Regions:
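Histidine-acidic metal/acid-base catalytic patches
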Residues: 2-63, 195-217, 221-306
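Active-site-proximal loop/turn and secondary-structure-junction residues that shape catalytic pockets
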Residues: 46-48, 74-76, 103-106, 148-150, ...
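Catalytic domains of carbohydrate-active enzymes, especially glycoside hydrolases
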Residues: 56-75, 138
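Glycine-rich, proline-tolerant flexible connector loops at the mouths of alpha/beta enzymes
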Residues: 71-91, 146-150
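Metal-dependent catalytic neighborhoods of phosphoester/phosphodiester hydrolases
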Residues: 80-86, 155, 287-290
Length: 306
């Protein structure tokens, strides 16, 4: 499942009144009896077989499993009334809001890399809009993907175009203490994109030189793109503000692929990371069985202190 699928699927969840769904209310195994060592953030649609399709019921279910963060790529497109309900629930339950996608992503044509002034203006306008969404949700981070390569320009000029635009976006975000996190995406799922490697994101963040421009290190994407995960995380550490998770192959929950998430989480925890790790992946199995498998997997890989 790729990012476009996540963005599209997240838009299908609608709001409603909060109640405990009978599908899970009586299951003693699903009560809030586990405290995670890190802030893993599920998304809408991950537990809809057990929690139901109502977004507020899903949030309650997420909380009841012990998760204390939540992310939603499609939050910006949701009705303000629902955003306010979500914000109220998160605040009352001491949960953190994770990333949402801040702008239109150009998957098939260049925008930020091109230096086109109209596309730059569009991007900055959408960043301004996202400030209001972040305020409403008490969110700190928003995802930025610089879009497609401009194959008619040298990579050096493209990089400069991206840096100049991100500096302007940082000027918008800094007064509000908000952070755009740049997400490198892998070549296999998203061929032709400008930003692919952690070192490239690190270089850009250093050039922008703003507390409002940091890295979203997606462990799934970087396993495919470059591997060598922990050394690369170490090299980029002081510019990483957010992590996302997914095993490879398959982009499903930890323990279903080749990545040793227990060791990675132990390393991240030892480094003192207290931010969010977004669960931006699918479920390896369908229905209730698959949702229980996700919960079990996170309890397994989170058990790294013993």
């Amino acid at each position: 499942m790729n990012r476009r699928d996540f963005v599209r699927n997240s838009s299908l969840v609608s709001g409603g009144l909060l109640y405990i769904n009978p599908a899970f209310a009586s299951d003693e195994n699903l009560k809030n009896n586990y405290t995670f060592n890190l802030k893993y953030a599920p998304h809408f649609g991950m537990f809809n077989n057990m929690a139901g399709n109502d977004s507020m019921d899903q949030l309650r279910f997420i909380y009841d499993q012990g998760f204390r963060a939540f992310e939603d790529n499609g939050m910006k497109g949701r009705k303000i009334e629902l955003q306010e309900k979500i914000s109220s629930f998160l605040n009352k339950n001491n949960m953190d809001m994770g990333v949402f996608v801040a702008h239109t992503i150009y998957w098939n044509e260049p925008n930020l890399a091109s230096g086109n002034m109209n596309k730059r203006k569009q991007f900055l306008s959408e960043i301004k809009e996202s400030v209001e969404v972040a305020k409403r949700l008490n969110a700190k981070w928003m995802t930025v993907v610089p879009g497609h390569l401009d194959l008619r320009q040298d990579i050096g000029y493209q990089t400069l175009n991206v840096i100049e635009t991100l500096k302007l976006a940082s000027d918008i975000l800094e007064p509000h203490n908000l952070v755009m996190v740049l997400e490198p995406l892998n070549f296999r799922d998203h061929p032709g994109l400008f930003l692919t490697k952690s070192s490239q994101a690190y270089e850009i963040c250093k050039a922008v030189d703003s507390p409002s421009c940091k890295i979203l290190y997606d462990i799934y994407h970087q396993q495919i793109e470059e591997g060598n995960l922990m050394p690369n995380i170490e090299n980029c550490w002081n510019e990483i503000a957010y992590f996302q998770i997914g095993d490879n192959p398959g982009r499903n929950e930890p323990t279903t692929g080749e990545i040793n998430y227990k060791n990675i989480f132990k390393y991240i925890h030892k480094k003192g990371y207290n931010g969010i790790l977004g669960m931006e992946h699918g479920n390896s199995k369908p229905n209730r069985e698959g949702e229980l498998a996700v919960i079990k997997a996170y309890k397994t890989v989170d058990n790294f202190l013993n």
